[in-house]
């Protein structure tokens, strides 16, 4: 295999990377980014890989969640806090039910670029560049806004750095106190008659903490009950940006992409001779691979061989996204193929992307029951094959949006217009994400995690 370099991806087939008119300006911006400090550190990436390896052995569980696409406009401390809070709540529920640590991985601090099937979009006879995410161009349908602008990469870095700084403060500064997190969950349980069915799980945590206090253990002084490890992830789509933030670790001489702890390869960029696969081949971060209906399992095995020739546990996570109606057809074949070749992978359910539909009013949405049904089917399929579900991948927000139908509050098509704010795909709101986690945790526990 040819030697890897930071820019060897340029010799491969590249898809879904925008074209810039001013290449000289782009090169200058990338040169500046190349001198900026790393956003994450090698030791953090290694710690995450160790935790993911434990998840492959049923000794941990991954919760990966956040916005479909971050935006410059909605950037605020409150939005970051609310997303972080929901991820903490989900983690507490799953830990209580499954009795294993939860790895907290945000789709945050870098998820600014989106793949597009077409380079252009036509509205009322006017054709402009597609919206590739705020790191590339603006969502407004004007010629000026839709022109890819390299300056946006500087703002992407700046906002990612600010977000990471706040997340680290939340994670280590007392906001993650377990008793506080559980009080939020109790608030959810008591907020509606339907929520009462989850009360037992929420009460378990209270009982554990009360017992520790009763025997003289000061829970306020136990670091693990008041702080958490929190990691970041995004699709490594914008390769010029990712290359500019790739660094050599001074301690190990290994190479890391320092824009996030965890990088994933999307369903549309996952193929042999892919520039994105080539880039990820050389970095030491843990890598996710999205797996949809178009996947050829035998080709995936070849890609895994490229990315993880030593079959290192924790290096590869397979994030499958088939949809409720297709998972029974595709997932068993994939699991059989991976098991046949003895590949060590973490199985993560992404019930979001395969269940996107159009509402009666033409809005993209997802139904809560479809998300739960797909994940439930995944749990049973993996168990029948001698494997296990090791994580969930959710597009969600801490805001009270109305973008997905169903759930405790029985949101319907007619409710979607109320608070439909997404820049890309529909997200679960805080209550829906938490309700889904209650159900998934119970199902996994019932099936013997």
Task: Give the location of each predicted region.
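Glycine-rich, charged/polar anion/phosphate-binding loops
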Residues: 47-49, 273-276, 303, 332-334
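Short, hydrophobic/glycine-enriched beta-strand segments
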Residues: 61-66, 103
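Active-site-facing alpha/beta catalytic cores
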Residues: 69-70, 74-323, 366, 374, ...
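Non-transmembrane, aqueous-exposed alpha-helical and coiled segments at domain scale
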Residues: 300-303, 309, 315-347, 353-402, ...
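A general structural signal for short secondary-structure junctions and capping/turn motifs
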Residues: 52-55, 93-95, 279-280, 381-384
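Short glycine-enriched loops at secondary-structure junctions
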Residues: 109, 352-353
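N-terminal basic/disordered segments at the start of proteins
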Residues: 1-61
């Amino acid at each position: 295999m040819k030697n890897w370099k930071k820019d060897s991806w340029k010799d491969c087939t590249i898809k879904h990377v925008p074209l810039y008119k001013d290449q000289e300006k782009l090169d200058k911006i990338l040169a500046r980014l190349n001198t900026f400090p790393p956003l994450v550190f090698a030791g953090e990436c290694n710690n995450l890989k160790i935790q993911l390896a434990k998840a492959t052995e049923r000794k941990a569980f991954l919760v990966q969640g956040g916005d479909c696409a971050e935006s410059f406009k909605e950037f605020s401390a409150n939005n970051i806090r609310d997303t972080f809070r929901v991820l903490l709540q989900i983690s507490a529920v799953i830990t209580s039910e499954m009795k294993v640590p939860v790895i907290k991985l945000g789709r945050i601090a870098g998820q600014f670029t989106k793949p597009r099937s077409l380079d252009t979009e036509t509205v009322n006879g006017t054709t402009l560049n597609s919206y590739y995410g705020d790191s590339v161009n603006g969502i407004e349908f004007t010629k000026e806004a839709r022109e890819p602008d390299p300056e946006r990469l500087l703002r992407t870095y700046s906002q990612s750095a600010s977000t990471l700084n706040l997340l680290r403060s939340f994670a280590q500064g007392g906001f993650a106190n377990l008793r506080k997190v559980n009080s939020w969950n109790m608030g959810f349980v008591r907020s509606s008659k339907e929520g009462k069915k989850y009360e037992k799980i929420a009460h378990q945590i209270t009982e554990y903490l009360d017992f520790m206090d009763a025997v003289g253990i000061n829970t306020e002084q136990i670091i693990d009950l008041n702080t958490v490890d929190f990691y970041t992830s995004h699709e490594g789509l914008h390769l010029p940006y990712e290359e500019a933030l790739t660094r050599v670790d001074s301690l190990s001489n290994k190479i890391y992409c320092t824009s996030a702890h965890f990088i994933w390869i999307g369903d549309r960029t996952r193929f042999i001779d892919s520039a994105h696969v080539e880039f990820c081949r050389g970095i030491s971060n843990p890598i996710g691979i999205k797996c949809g209906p178009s996947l050829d399992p035998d080709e995936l095995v070849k890609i895994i061989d490229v990315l993880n020739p030593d079959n290192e546990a924790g290096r590869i996570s397979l994030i499958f996204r088939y949809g409720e109606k297709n998972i029974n057809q595709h997932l068993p074949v994939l699991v059989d193929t991976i098991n046949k070749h003895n590949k060590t992978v973490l199985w993560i359910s992404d019930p979001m992307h395969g269940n996107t539909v159009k509402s009666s009013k033409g809005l993209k949405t997802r139904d809560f029951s479809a998300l739960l049904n797909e994940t439930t089917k995944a749990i049973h399929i993996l168990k029948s094959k001698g494997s296990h579900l090791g994580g969930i991948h959710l597009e969600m927000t801490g805001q009270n949006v109305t973008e997905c139908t169903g759930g405790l509050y029985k949101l319907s098509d007619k409710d979607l217009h109320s608070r439909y704010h997404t820049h890309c795909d529909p997200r679960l709101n805080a209550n829906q994400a938490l309700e889904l986690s209650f159900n998934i945790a119970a199902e996994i526990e019932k099936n013997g995690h």
